[in-house]
Amino acid sequence: MEGKRYRNRTTEICQILAKDECRFAYGVQNLVSLRSEKFEEGYSYHILTDGKVDMLNHLRWLMMLYGRIDEVYLSSWSINATNILMLESWHDSGELGDVNLIVGDIFPAKFKEEWKALVKLRDKGTIARLFTGRIHAKIILARAASGEEIVVETSANANMNPRCEQSTVSVSRELFDFYKSYFDVKFGEYVRKQSAKELTFERLDYEADYSEGTALFGQDD
């Protein structure tokens, strides 16, 4: 049997289809069924899904557990139309504050209508910062209005798919700052690694120079 062929969108993004909204809600409900209360600080929670749970399902889950998210950093190789419109809806409703988004460097050329929609949201103020880069990491950094700083590390992009994905949720200011410092340095850059040198941080020093290669979270003994 010939596999289904997926074509890139050629029409303007304007509304969420009912079937996609149901799929999104299903993914969120799967996560809520795992935990319906806040995560304990200092712990990491490891999750393995059997498909149909994407990156932004996790963000919606956090919003349900913590209420308003004042600031979020998102990195994803790609993002689909449904999730773009979800971000706009949450921001318009006041549930979500500043959105900082980095997508893969090929995204504007490969997903032209989705990129146009993201640029519109940036111009509108929904997205505070929008960049492309040579990135394949899928990360959510969420700062809740209640003060918690939550990190989601996941294999899932911000698009719905039937594949098994894994994620880890941590409430940790140190881990949040570790990733945020990298985002702040690398937003908008096409990173050219000049060496594979690992940087270790004494006393969790997040002002380290990332230009030399890979960053390692941790503290020297």
Predicted regions: what is each one?
Residues M1-D221:
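PLD/PLD-like phosphodiesterase catalytic module centered on the HKD motif
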